[in-house]
Amino acid sequence: MPEGPSVRKFHHLVSPFVGQKVVKTGGSSKKLHPAAFQSLWLQDAQVHGKKLFLRFDPDEEMEPLNSSPQPIQGMWQKEAVDRELALGPSAQEPSAGPSGSGEPVPSRSAETYNLGKIPSADAQRWLEVRFGLFGSIWVNDFSRAKKANKKGDWRDPVPRLVLHFSGGGFLVFYNCQMSWSPPPVIEPTCDILSEKFHRGQALEALSQAQPVCYTLLDQRYFSGLGNIIKNEALYRARIHPLSLGSCLSSSSREALVDHVVEFSKDWLRDKFQGKERHTQIYQKEQCPSGHQVMKETFGPPDGLQRLTWWCPQCQPQLSSKGPQNLPSS
C-alpha cells in the first residue's frame, strides 16, 4: 500500500477542495454508495501515517480545525503535481490486524457507524480511506491503462469513488477501502513525517529482542513506514533485517532512525518536485557496491509476511551475544 510520503501527497491534492460542496458523484464502490456524498460539504482533511481522513458535513458551516500536517522544512510551499500515477491492475495487500497496528484511535465506539450509510445528522461524517497496493487519488483527470491486462484488453482502471465539487473540479479515488468512522484521534509522535515524531519512543521500540524488520513496520511507533522505507533504511544503516534490536548498539539504532526519517522526507520532497524515487536496495539485484542482493519473505509468525531485500556483505547478520556496532555507511 502507499506509504507515508504518498498519502501526504494525496492529502495535499485533496486540501484545495476543503470548503466546497459535492454536486455530483460516481464510482464503483458497493459497500459505501457514492450517492451518499451528494450535497455534502468537504470540511476537513487529515492524514496520519498511511491513512487519509475526510470530514463531510451537510451544511457550509466550518469549525476551525488544525488539519494540515506539520510542514517539513518548507516543502509544503512547493506546488504538487496534480497526478499520481496508478500502476497496474487493482490489488490490495492484506491489512494488519488490530494488534500492533498503531492506527488512530476512535474517540467513540465505531459500532454506531456503518460502511454504506451516512452517520446520523448530529454525528461528524468522517470518511476513513485506506489505500491498496496501487491506490491513488487523481485531480481533474482519470487514470488510463498503461498496458494490456492478462486477457489482452486495454481497460482503464475503474475508480472506486468520483466526487465533483461546486468549484468545478473533481477528485477520483482508485484502489482503496472507504468507510465512515468516528472522528480520528491523531498521535503525531509516532508519525515518521511529523516534526513531533518521538525519537526516544522509536529507539525504545527498536531495542526489543525481536528482528528490527518486524519493529519498523509496527505502526504504533513508525506510522507511515512501509516496506520500501523499511528496506532502504536498513540497507543505509548497514543492518541485517533479522538482527535483534536488543543486540544492536545504541548508535546503530540511532543511525537506523536517522535513515528512516531522512529517506522518508527525501522521498516526499521528490514527489513534490516530480522526481523519481531513488532506491538503493529495494527490488534491486545488486547493491550500489556491486554485491549480489538477497530476497526473502520475513514477518512475525502470526503477522504479515513481507518481501525483504538485503546485501549479506553490507548488512552482515549479528550473533545474539550482545550489543554490537555495525559497519558505518
UniProtKB/Swiss-Prot annotation:
Region feature (Disordered): 88-112
EC number: 3.2.2.-, 4.2.99.18
Residues at which DNA binds: N227
SMART domains: H2TH (SM01232)
Gene3D superfamilies, per the entry: 1.10.8.50
SUPFAM superfamilies for the chain: S13-like H2TH domain
One example GO MF annotation: class I DNA-(apurinic or apyrimidinic site) endonuclease activity
GO biological process per UniProt: base-excision repair
Top-level taxon: Eukaryota
Residue numbers carrying N6-acetyllysine: K50, K150
Stretches annotated zinc finger (FPG-type): 280-316
Alphabetic keyword roster: Acetylation, DNA damage, DNA repair, DNA-binding, Glycosidase, Hydrolase, Lyase, Metal-binding, Multifunctional enzyme, Nucleus, Phosphoprotein, Zinc, Zinc-finger
Subcellular location: Nucleus
GO cellular component terms, A-Z: cytoplasm; microtubule cytoskeleton; mitotic spindle; nucleoplasm
Catalytic site: P2 (schiff-base intermediate with dna), E3 (proton donor), K50 (proton donor), R306 (proton donor)
Phosphoserine carried by residues: S68
Regulation: Acetylation of Lys-50 leads to loss of DNA nicking activity.
Major localisation: nucleus
UniProt catalytic activity: 2'-deoxyribonucleotide-(2'-deoxyribose 5'-phosphate)-2'-deoxyribonucleotide-DNA = a 3'-end 2'-deoxyribonucleotide-(2,3-dehydro-2,3-deoxyribose 5'-phosphate)-DNA + a 5'-end 5'-phospho-2'-deoxyribonucleoside-DNA + H(+)
Keyword Magnesium: no
PANTHER family referenced in this protein's UniProt entry, alphabetically: ENDONUCLEASE 8-LIKE 2, FORMAMIDOPYRIMIDINE-DNA GLYCOSYLASE
Function of the molecule: Involved in base excision repair of DNA damaged by oxidation or by mutagenic agents. Has DNA glycosylase activity towards 5-hydroxyuracil and other oxidized derivatives of cytosine with a preference for mismatched double-stranded DNA (DNA bubbles). Has low or no DNA glycosylase activity towards thymine glycol, 2-hydroxyadenine, hypoxanthine and 8-oxoguanine. Has AP (apurinic/apyrimidinic) lyase activity and introduces nicks in the DNA strand. Cleaves the DNA backbone by beta-delta elimination to generate a single-strand break at the site of the removed base with both 3'- and 5'-phosphates.
Protein name: Endonuclease 8-like 2
Organism expressing this protein natively: Mus musculus
Gene that this sequence comes from: Neil2
